[in-house]
Amino acid sequence: MNKRVKIVATLGPAVEIRGGKKYGEDGYWSGKLDVEASAKNIAKLIEAGANTFRFNFSHGDHQEQGDRMATVKLAEKLAGKKVGFLLDTKGPEIRTELFEGDAKEYSYTTGEKIRVATKQGIQSTREVIALNVAGSLDIYDDVEVGRQVLIDDGKLGLRVVAKDDVTREFEVEVENDGVIAKQKGVNIPNTKIPFPALAERDNDDIRFGLEQGINFIAISFVRTAKDVEEVRAICKETGNGHVQLFAKIENQQGIDNLDEIIEAADGIMIARGDMGIEVPYEMVPVYQKMIIKKVNAAGKVVITATNMLETMTEKPRATRSEVSDVFNAVIDGTDATMLSGESANGKYPLESVTTMATIDKNAQTLLSEYGRLNSDSFERNSKTEVMASAVKDATNSMDIKLIVTLTKTGHTARLISKYRPNADILALTFDELTERGLMLNWGVIPMLTDAPSSTDDMFEIAERKAVEAGLVQSGDDIVIVAGVPVGEAVRTNTMRIRTVR
């Protein structure tokens, strides 16, 4: 059995060699990126189980991210496997501003009072922390006295105790000992801020990524379907309508509008980091299960992300609770699990991917016993959906080793994946964009092939490719799903059970 749960690994300096130095060594950032050496490290991640690489545009410029993407393309050749490319937008963030002078961070003690400035374009001092707000918004009028301001994923909490209408600054009280560093994320829970749907930087980043040939875009802080539609318009305008859009759900507004967002997007990323700050933390696992269930029913891809193996950023082994977290996400029905800092800037990127792959593969063997996905409740509202359901029934009733589907758009493979059949899904397609677009679907092994010349040729190709890929051998039973007659614009209408010769 192959690993059916997909892994998204975030790339960063952890796997990159610069000037002969590894990340963390003196002089690392002054060196030039060694593409070949870095590609060898990334190839190891692919071999360990990474299916798609995430490029986090909250960090780095176009030059850095472009070099990173080029390195992955070389790594694909070294590993002999293709992967997906996912661009994650910075989104409408609030961050602490740059500091005056040479200061790197300021320390504070509980009960201390300082001020927070909302005026844009100024630098921070120890007494007045300035905020950099997406869209250059002045959020003074949006934040009420009594609200909490959380710095760096909640590591430092501030409470607004007064507002100064003259300076348009908040007086805040420090709630715990800690530090404030420059350019750290800021969250203000239970506060609606009128961010633009798409910041100018995000627009530029998306267009750059499309030029590089990305396959997926994760849209940060999605609040309504309109946020997704704006990005979709850019993709279509530039001739990239095939690029799949993942809405990141990370605040209460996104949760409240979840149904319309699922309908508008191609998939959902459960971004638990900011979600755990923006909503009560005890609700995060509740929302995770709810989101996975809804996305499963819609037949779309769901990625569970953030802090999954956080300990492995610094240590070579995951905690028992982290192992349970990854396991339970798979049991809940996630299509993919994601590594963030673990693979981007951690000390053990390869071990993190290997560990996640091991947990994912173990969990998938227990889906029939413990899995929460109930495909019996899915609406079968098309011939293809009925066919996908029948394929699952066949794998449950017989010892089917493999499902092979010939698909032009990937639609049939996605529907079969939706039902979580008890066999791998080999998706043979004639379009490389479709091949890469299936990199995140549960259980799907996408592969490029020549278009068949006839129906008989189609079945021969399906069997031959399955054998060549090492997925089956003589005597194994396989299910082949396709639309016939070949060459005509027909939907999937044929399912054949065939014994490999």
Language-model features: locations:
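Non-catalytic helical/linker scaffolds that mediate oligomerization, partner binding
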Residues: 1-501
